[in-house]
């Protein structure tokens, strides 16, 4: 009997609408779950949401709703997306689920009792967006005042940090560092792809593994520590334990935990959260005396030609749009075919439409159309009985399919989806070539060889049956459509697949429907670009061309790169007051959507004698100016943009519906 198989996605942080990069991991895990089921494994597939933390509390406050209502709304949206993408998960866990919170609290107290957690004090640079502390040396950028003192900075993720000093409980990671290194040496294939484990050891363990702050007192949206309820459990103990609690760990009914945690345990995460899963999670399991997972895969990201997805760049792609326009299977196929193992992949509208036309419509769709049409034409719709070596080309086709099936299974086990699909398309290409080699239209003539013609039709149908089986984990609808046109039931097993196993006396459909109609390349590329917001890239019937004249400007011309370095954000005015001792300056407290209010001083007092009229307005600010001390103790952390017209000045505002922190560009 095959071992039970447990596959997990990371639990996603519900801070905004998910794009195709966010959907990749869930589809990738779904493909593996479906493959393992077809191979005879009992599978448990887990996904869900990480719903606690300061960022959630802040966003809920901005929206004027409770944190629970905020995460309830996000969970509804995410579940709807997974339904659209036909994700076959068994459980959708939310860290606000009662059973999970109860186990988190109990585990915290257990680790406290065994001295793997202790009370201390933490002072350091904290990123609300990352929910992570950083040392000064880890910061990507450091802000200093005029005296050279560090007053802020930017985390490696690009998010701002703030200085936090508070009482905190700590997890004794340092106590387990040697044991973790020994585990890595015993299990060199634990982290995939190759090289990722070495990154973790070199960057985080060899420099000295520091104990981890695992509680906070500056916000309340989390699991309270039972013995010290002014503390809430910090994200990583809370979030990581979901992989165990979802199966019943620490609960009365723990049958699934006993079964699946003692089977094959397989985690898949994005490379940005590998550290937490490769260091914190194994150590937490050691503390709890639980078995280690079998495999941890850290995949790359989908990026655009001009870098990471950004609304301001007009390059964000949402899965809903692609599914509505092109269907589900092309999206699943494209994402799994286009991201190489261990590296990033690039999404382009041209590549997306091109793969549909050339690989799905031309290669696969035409093969099915031609095969069904010829079986109807030459054998009244009945697939001839399969025989070996009916033509001089049968043996080569059969041998190639056997070899590619072996490669397919090898790559599927390694979660190398691009190569697994490459093996499938090698079968498709060889089968298309087989039609040209055997020339069935010649064999069908009066003086042709009807026995060879029958063998050709049988081999074509048998090859398509093989293809329908191996694409099923990726493209369920397409697999079922191929099987239906061949007169067969949907795929239910992959463990014993052979070319010669085509059922006898099978009738194909009388007239096949194209499974992938060809697309108008230019029109569909333009459609995707329009949905992304990149209207400048859309083909125009008549393009306006400006005259070559010297442009007028009051300042020196700058390059686009220089301008692109300026980050302009939407910021809501929370408070505004006059600065004592200054007739020009107003002091603003604004929310720029980065989890903490910032102070900006602006010399616009004479234009706004009733400065309180600005409270609640959404302004445009330069968010990445180096902070500077302007008067007395006040430091300005940005610049408010305004327009001069004659002797008047007006601050630039945006519509109240635009979220705080939105990037303008």
UniProtKB/Swiss-Prot annotation:
* Protein's UniProt keywords contain ATP-binding: yes
> 'KMSKS' region: where is this motif?
308-312
Domain tRNA-binding spans what residues? Answer: 562-665
Where ATP binds, per the record, is at 311
**Single GO biological process annotation from the record:** methionyl-tRNA aminoacylation
What is catalysed by this protein?
tRNA(Met) + L-methionine + ATP = L-methionyl-tRNA(Met) + AMP + diphosphate
One cellular component term (GO) for this entry is: cytoplasm
Provide the protein's localization: Cytoplasm
Q: Which family does it belong to?
A: Belongs to the class-I aminoacyl-tRNA synthetase family. MetG type 2B subfamily.
Description of how the protein assembles with itself and partners = Homodimer.
Role description: Is required not only for elongation of protein synthesis but also for the initiation of all mRNA translation through initiator tRNA(fMet) aminoacylation.
Name this polypeptide is given: Methionine--tRNA ligase
